[in-house]
Amino acid sequence: MAATSPQWASPLLVTSCFVALWVAVTWLLSYASGWVALARLYRADREAVGIPVRMRAARMGRGATGQFRNVLTLWVGTEGIQLRLQWLFRINSPDLFVPWTEIAVTRGRQFFFDYIELKFLQAPDIPLRLYGESAERVCAAAAEHWPEKKMELAAPL
């Protein structure tokens, strides 16, 4: 008797299941990280302009679900920053554009790592932390547009 592979092991079925799982997980992470909430407020309505800086390490929101390693690019321009995920991770995560007037910056240290934290005026509970050399490149690219002063964040409704 010849052994046959089970029906569920067909390459088409395995590939389909993988794609469905990828879409589902990416969709859920877009909500868990806060990207969807930011998209309601800061969805980009233009092409990315400025100096692109690929983030080696960044975190959005307060939990561990918003970790971005080598999949997030920030375009630093004269009017603000634009955030874009790589296409494989862009499901339910449209580009964001945040003007400099909507950003407050703080610096900190967690364990042995320095970071720059961006807080957004309309969504102060969804910070964006940028780590390491990439964070410093964003700061340098912004030059005189970098928000030096802390601004008063909007009071919760």
Protein language model features and the residues they cover:
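Short charge-dense sequence patches
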Residues: 50-56, 86-93, 133
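Acidic, Ser/Thr- and proline-rich intrinsically disordered linker/docking segments
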Residues: 40-53, 102-157
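Phosphoinositide-binding peripheral membrane targeting modules
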Residues: 78-113
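Anionic N-terminal interaction surfaces
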Residues: 2-76
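Short leucine-rich amphipathic alpha-helices used at interfaces
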Residues: 9, 80-81, 124
